[in-house]
Amino acid sequence: MSEASDPRGHIQLSGPDSRKFLQGQVTCDMDLLTPEQSIKGAQCTPKGRIIFLFEASCDSQDNIILETHSSITEIAIASLKKYAVFFKTQITDISGQVATEKVTDLQRLRTGAADITAETSELFIPQMINLDALGYISFKKGCYTGQEVVARAHYRGAVKRRMHHLKIHASRLPEPGSEILNSEGKAIGHIASAAQADEASVEVLAVLADKSSDCTEIGVDGQTVSVTHLKLPYEIPTGP
C-alpha cells in the first residue's frame, strides 16, 4: 500500500506592513515569529470559522511565508487580499518554489493535527480541531478577525464539539468534511482528516459532539463502521 503525502502550498507576504497586517488577521502572535522560529496559526471568518491553517516562517528581510494545504492556497490568498487593501503588503503564490520535508497523510494525522482543506474551510472553529491544545492560538494578543468568538469559546467553556483520533474498520477512505452519523442516523460530527492505516482500516481525526464522543459505531459516506478510539498525543484543555 502506498502512503499518500499531503501536498503543501506556499504564500509569500512582502512589504513593510506584512507582519502588522497578519497580526490583525490570525490567531497566533506574529510578534513571536523570527527567522529562527516558525509559528502556527489560523485565519478565521468574523464568525470564528477557520478559513485556513498555516505554518509561518520569515527571512532576515521579514518576508513571511505561509505554508498551508495546497487545496486551500487560492482560497487563502483571496481571503487575505480582501483585508489587505489598506496595508503595504504584497501577497504572492510561490507554491513549488519552496523545498519542504515530505510528510505522509498518516504521519501528520498521528500528530493529532488536522489540515483545513477546500472541503473543510469555514466548517470548524479553532477549538473544535483542538488548536488551543496545539499552540495555534494566543489569548494574550490584540484583536484579530474572529477573536470574539474564539475567546468566548475559551473563557466561557462553550466548546461542545472536539476532535478525536479514531480507527475505523473500513477500506474506503472518507472525504474531509464528510458528515458522521450515529447508530440512529443522527448527525454527530464531521471528518476533519483521514488516512489509510492498512488494507482494512482507516485512521481519522473526527470532530464529534461531546455527548457522542464515546461512540463505538458510526455511519460515514454511506457505510456503517465500527470504531476504535485512539489516544491523542496531547491533552485537550478543559477550561480557560
Locate each region found by the language model.
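A generic structural signal for short beta-strands and their flanking turns/coil linkers
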Residues: 9, 39, 62, 87, ...
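Hydrophobic side chains in well-ordered alpha-helices
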Residues: 21-22, 76-79, 162
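Short, solvent-exposed amphipathic alpha-helical segments in soluble enzyme
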Residues: 26-31, 81-85, 181-183
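Acidic, proline/glycine-enriched N-terminal capping motif
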Residues: 1-53, 58-61
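Residue-level signal for inorganic ion chemistry
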Residues: 15, 66, 146, 185
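Glycine-rich, small/acidic residue-mixed loop/short-helix segments
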Residues: 50, 129-137, 151-240
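Anionic-ligand-binding alpha/beta catalytic cores of soluble enzymes and soluble regulatory domains
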Residues: 102-167
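Acidic, low-complexity central loop/insert segments
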Residues: 2-5, 9-12, 55-112
